[in-house]
């Protein structure tokens, strides 16, 4: 994470372990919850690795690995080591069989509830069949329908999971196939997985590093660690040990990184899973996926539903036994009540709502791999964001210039309209010439029509930035170079820390040469004796050195990478045309040069990021930067994008302002805090948690993959729902551990993408804010959909309760309930997913996962016992009306059930003395089913209208803003008409044609529901915080 020339990953302890093994000491980290070998192994992997191979002399390395730095290992020893250590490959964890993955999709919270309901239906069917009381196959049909719903939604979920691949497979793609090895003094090619520790290997530009290598010889070798760290800045590799950390030092090349240029020879010090990338692979695959908040909410909801279903069922089982029913009959009643209480359509509703939101997010460059992650986006309270490519553009850009004793802001736009300095200045012309000529980068051919910022450049990041800036200011940088032919060049190296080239001048009448140099500012300045000011060479005295130092510190303090530039005209007398410049003999001057100026570069923030961070702050979401970059650069970028807000100070800032030592400052006075990897390594978990609690604005720099994982766990320990962004292989463990992992689609490695739950196709942090908004909206709308879905459970349940306790003919059948749950009500409940937000949801704080539940007590009470009760009254009113108009008055219906269901009784008399056969009574019962069905549907139209809002009036929200909902209501009514009046329905699905006036009976109840809810919302709006608000706002 983050762009940096150096990158710290693990700590170092002096002293090799016995037997050639790496030191086993680990920095102490707090163990996570739970026990077991797997958990202990994961905790050990989180700890920092300690090796010292980079600090040993060549002789000590030869002794440690029983090898030769010139001839390599013997073939026999190599064979023994391969047998002992195994192949140089990443060992994948035991894969999960596909059938197990599919089975998991069938065993979620709601799925289990529906499996139980299906089993109960089958048991009830079997009991009825055994008693010879099987007048209908409704229970069998209901069981089959429930199983079908679970299987179909399970297939959908499995398809979503199937699209993502195993994390370890992406690491395999990083492993090189071949390696050049020297054994017994002979050089040959072998498969990379046959390498062992102690092998002497060679690599060149274009090769992947075949293992963790200690460099013994190198010529201009540079490696690209982007596959490991996500960074694009090339890293120089040489035999010298330059730092105590193996990742800071230049004499270690890491497994799977790319050798960009030059050649190198070295000894293998780690292979396979013992390499750095091997440890990261093991760490990522060992991290278990956390339950998403929505999964936790659904489990909580299932617990409520199951508890209430069993409570109601047990209550009426006891009542049935007391009334005099047989045990088996009472058990059938118990099962019927439990099944009636299960919201069969809810699983499909939740799945479809999440899928619709995922589709909306995909249109906004956010691809969601896990449907449950959609809601998690809205729940998150902390974002641990990578810097490079996420907050920044992942492209080094010239930002500031210092010449003529002034710092100028560079304009990198196409039209150069913002360039404020005088481009006719002789000093500027000289500086521009140096940065153009002393540059090895080149544009890829055939890009003349491509805008300069988007052109592909062959070269490293810094030289690319300089070339593009030169192209924008001069107009044709490549053509400009051709006018100054290069006759000699010394490439940049870690020893000299400068790059030098000598050119002939463009004027054929001027036979002189010009020497141009760029490099580390202090190294360039020490080779200069004069400075160019307003086109004149002035002596580089103490005054100008102080001016240089002030400018250098000012630019460096901005977290920018600074380069110095100088030049020297070589006299014609000493260096005539055709002079043989020799870079080995250095037969030309490299001192007494003329300093031209400084140029600073930075990977600039994306233009949309500051606004996105501000929106996060407004929404109560904390943004933490976690990067591998230098602390100064990290702090500068954090301040520029708003992660560290204006006026916020770190402990160091306060100490500098008060001019006191840092240890005299109260850390709690600092709102912001920047912690580097070395400091983090020395902190125990409680100290890290305290730092996160104390400082609202946090930046972590120079962090390792293990440390990123620890940071995520610490945030979760504070009760936060954590999102992590990343693009490198090193990010994959934290991405998997987070509540939601967000990978970059353009710059992201395959490992990061596979570990993540969501992929940003445009690599833009602002897209995450879009995801937050959609996630919050879907949580609100899921609440509305669930409230709508649950309401009809009561009018579906009460017919069975009255049927058992009062013994009336059954008002509503199982098949009719299925049509309500899985047909007519699905469309309105899904249409609520399209509802617009009632207010600016991005001005609300993230929901508290322990307090703000998807299904809370007010929602259940209001849906079940208020709106649901009104719907039940509507259904029974229509039911008794239909029975009375056919001759069965309400009082006669009480206790009628045993006679009504007796298929041997063919002359049962109604209130008018008319005799009814069993077949006629059965058709009348189907008519009652249909009437009750229509009553529920008419009331549900009012219910879906009131569910459009939870606080605002429906008039404020607008009835027709959600066109999908209007279409769903029309479709619902059409289905109801079709089921009632389509020929053949009585024999197929037990629906009968009904009188038109029976459609009108429930309408007053629907109006009552609407008015009742408007009164509730008015009270909620007028009395915030009151008893009314607490009990009736869901």
Curated annotation (Swiss-Prot):
Molecular function as annotated in GO: ATP binding; ATP hydrolysis activity; magnesium ion binding; P-type potassium:proton transporter activity; P-type sodium:potassium-exchanging transporter activity; potassium ion binding
Q: Where is the composition biased (Polar residues)?
A: 225-239
Q: Tell me the Pfam families matching this sequence.
A: Cation_ATPase, Cation_ATPase_C, Cation_ATPase_N, E1-E2_ATPase, H-K_ATPase_N, Hydrolase
Record membrane topology: Multi-pass membrane protein
Q: Where in the cell is it found?
A: Apical cell membrane
Q: Which InterPro entries does UniProt cross-reference here?
A: ATPase_P-typ_cation-transptr_C, ATPase_P-typ_cation-transptr_N, ATPase_P-typ_cyto_dom_N, ATPase_P-typ_H/K-transp_N, ATPase_P-typ_P_site, ATPase_P-typ_TM_dom_sf, ATPase_P-typ_transduc_dom_A_sf, Cation_transp_ATPase_P-type
- List every position bearing Phosphotyrosine: 7, 10
Q: Which top EC class is given?
A: translocase
Q: Which residues bind K(+)?
A: 339-340, 342, 344, 796, 821
Q: Quick one: which residues bind Mg(2+)?
A: 386, 388, 727, 731
UniProt family annotation: Belongs to the cation transport ATPase (P-type) (TC 3.A.3) family. Type IIC subfamily.
Q: Indicate the quaternary assembly.
A: The gastric H(+)/K(+) ATPase pump is composed of the catalytic alpha subunit ATP4A and the regulatory beta subunit ATP4B. Interacts (via the P-domain) with ATP4B (via N-terminus); this interaction stabilizes the lumenal-open E2 conformation state and prevents the reverse reaction of the transport cycle.
What does this chain do?
The catalytic subunit of the gastric H(+)/K(+) ATPase pump which transports H(+) ions in exchange for K(+) ions across the apical membrane of parietal cells. Uses ATP as an energy source to pump H(+) ions to the gastric lumen while transporting K(+) ion from the lumen into the cell. Remarkably generates a million-fold proton gradient across the gastric parietal cell membrane, acidifying the gastric juice down to pH 1.
Record-given protein name = Potassium-transporting ATPase alpha chain 1
Organism in which the protein naturally occurs: Canis lupus familiaris
Organism lineage reads as: Eukaryota, Metazoa, Chordata, Craniata, Vertebrata
């Amino acid at each position: 994470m983050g762009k940096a020339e150096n990158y710290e990953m693990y700590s170092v302890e002096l002293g090799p372990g016995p037997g050639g093994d790496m030191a086993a000491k680990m920095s102490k980290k707090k163990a996570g919850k739970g026990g077991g070998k797997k958990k202990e192994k994961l905790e050990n992997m989180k700890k920092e690795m300690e090796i010292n191979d980079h600090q040993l002399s060549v002789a000590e390395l030869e002794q440690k690995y029983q090898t030769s730095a010139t001839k390599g290992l013997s073939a026999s020893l190599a064979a023994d080591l391969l047998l002992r250590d195994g192949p140089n490959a990443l060992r994948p964890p035991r894969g999960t069989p596909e059938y197990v993955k599919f089975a998991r999709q069938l065993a979620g919270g709601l799925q289990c509830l529906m499996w139980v309901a299906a089993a109960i239906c089958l048991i009830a069917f079997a009991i009825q069949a055994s008693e010879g009381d099987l007048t209908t196959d409704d229970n069998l049909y209901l069981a089959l329908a429930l199983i079908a719903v679970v299987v179909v939604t399970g297939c959908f979920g499995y398809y979503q999971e199937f699209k993502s691949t195993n994390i370890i497979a992406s690491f395999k793609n990083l492993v090189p196939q071949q390696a050049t090895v020297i054994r017994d003094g002979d050089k040959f090619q072998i498969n990379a997985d046959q390498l062992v520790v102690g092998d002497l290997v060679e690599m060149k530009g274009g090769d992947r590093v075949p293992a963790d290598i200690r460099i013994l010889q190198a010529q201009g070798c540079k490696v690209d660690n982007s596959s490991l760290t996500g960074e694009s800045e090339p890293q120089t590799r040489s035999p010298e040990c330059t730092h105590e950390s193996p990742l800071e030092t230049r004499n270690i090349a890491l497994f799977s990184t790319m050798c960009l240029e030059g050649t190198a020879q070295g000894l293998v010090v780690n292979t396979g899973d013992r390499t750095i990338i091997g440890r990261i692979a093991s760490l990522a695959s060992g991290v278990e996926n956390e339950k998403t908040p929505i999964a936790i909410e659904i489990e909580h909801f299932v617990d409520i539903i199951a508890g209430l279903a069993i409570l109601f069922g047990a209550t009426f089982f006891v009542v049935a036994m007391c009334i005099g029913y047989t045990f088996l009959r009472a058990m059938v009643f118990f099962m019927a009540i439990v099944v009636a209480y299960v919201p069969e359509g809810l699983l499909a509703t939740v799945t479809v709502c999440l899928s619709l939101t995922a589709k909306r997010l995909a249109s906004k460059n956010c691809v969601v791999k896990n449907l449950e992650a959609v809601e998690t986006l809205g729940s998150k309270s902390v974002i641990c964001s990578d810097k490079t490519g996420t907050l920044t553009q992942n492209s080094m850009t010239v930002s500031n210039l210092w010449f003529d004793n002034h710092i100028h802001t560079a304009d990198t736009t196409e039209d150069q309209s913002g360039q404020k300095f005088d481009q006719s200045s002789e000093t500027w012309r000289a500086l521009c010439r140096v940065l153009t000529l002393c540059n090895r980068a080149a544009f890829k051919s055939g890009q003349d029509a491509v805008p300069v910022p988007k052109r592909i450049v062959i070269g490293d990041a810094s030289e690319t930035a300089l070339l593009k800036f030169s192209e924008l200011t001069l107009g044709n940088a490549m053509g400009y170079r051709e006018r100054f032919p290069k006759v000699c060049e010394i490439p940049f190296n870690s020893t000299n820390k400068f790059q030098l080239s000598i050119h002939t001048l463009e004027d054929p009448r001027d036979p002189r040469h010009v020497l141009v140099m760029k490099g580390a500012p202090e190294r360039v300045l020490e080779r200069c004796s004069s400075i160019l000011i307003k086109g004149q060479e002035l002596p580089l005295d103490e005054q100008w050195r102080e001016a240089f130092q002030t400018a250098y510190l000012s630019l460096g303090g901005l977290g920018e990478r600074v380069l110095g530039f100088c030049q020297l005209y070589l006299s014609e007398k000493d260096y005539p045309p055709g002079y043989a410049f020799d870079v080995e003999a250095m037969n030309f001057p490299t001192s007494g040069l003329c300093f031209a100026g400084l140029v600073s570069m930075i990977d600039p923030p994306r233009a949309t990021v500051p606004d996105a961070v501000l929106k996060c702050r407004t929404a109560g979401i904390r943004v933490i930067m976690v990067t591998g970059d230098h602390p100064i650069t990290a702090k500068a970028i954090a301040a520029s994008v708003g992660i560290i807000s204006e006026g916020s100070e770190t402990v160091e800032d306060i100490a500098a302002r008060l001019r006191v030592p840092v240890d005299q400052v109260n850390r709690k006075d600092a709102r912001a805090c920047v912690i580097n990897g070395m400091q983090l390594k020395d902190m125990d978990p409680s100290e890290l948690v305290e730092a996160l609690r104390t400082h609202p604005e946090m930046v972590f720099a120079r962090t390792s993959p293990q440390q990123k994982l620890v940071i995520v766990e610490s945030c979760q320990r504070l009760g936060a729902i954590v999102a992590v962004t990343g693009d490198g292989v090193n990010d994959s463990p934290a991405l998997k551990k987070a509540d939601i992992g967000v990978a970059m689609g353009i710059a992201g490695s395959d490992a990061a993408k596979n570990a993540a739950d969501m992929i940003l196709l445009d690599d833009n942090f602002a897209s995450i804010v879009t995801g937050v908004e959609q996630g919050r909206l879907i949580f609100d709308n899921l609440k509305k959909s669930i409230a709508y879905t649950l309401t009809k459970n009561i009018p579906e349940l009460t017919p069975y309760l009255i049927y058992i306790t009062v013994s009336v003919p059954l008002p509503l059948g199982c098949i009719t309930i299925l049509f309500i749950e899985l047909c007519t009500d699905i469309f309105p409940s899904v249409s609520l997913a399209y509802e617009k937000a009632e207010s600016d949801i991005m001005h609300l704080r993230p929901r508290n996962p322990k307090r703000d539940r998807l299904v809370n007590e007010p929602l259940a009470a209001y849906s079940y016992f208020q709106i649901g009760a009104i719907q039940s009254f509507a259904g029974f009113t229509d039911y008794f009306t239909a029975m009375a108009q056919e001759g069965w008055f309400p009082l006669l219906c009480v206790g009628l059930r045993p006679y009504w269901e007796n298929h041997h009784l063919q002359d049962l008399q109604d209130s008018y003395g008319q005799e009814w056969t069993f077949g006629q009574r059965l058709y009348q019962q189907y008519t009652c089913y249909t009437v009750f069905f229509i009553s529920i549907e008419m009331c549900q139209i009012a219910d879906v209208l009131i569910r459009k809002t939870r606080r605002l009036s429906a008039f404020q929200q607008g009835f027709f803003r959600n066109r999908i909902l209007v279409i769903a209501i029309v479709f619902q009514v059409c289905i109801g008409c079709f089921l009632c009046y389509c020929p053949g329905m009585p024999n197929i699905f037990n629906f009968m044609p009904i009188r038109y006036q029976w459609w009108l009976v429930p309408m007053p109840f629907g109006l009552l529901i609407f008015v009742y809810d408007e009164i509730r919302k008015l009270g909620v709006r007028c009395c915030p915080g009151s008893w009314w608000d607490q009990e009736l706002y869901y």
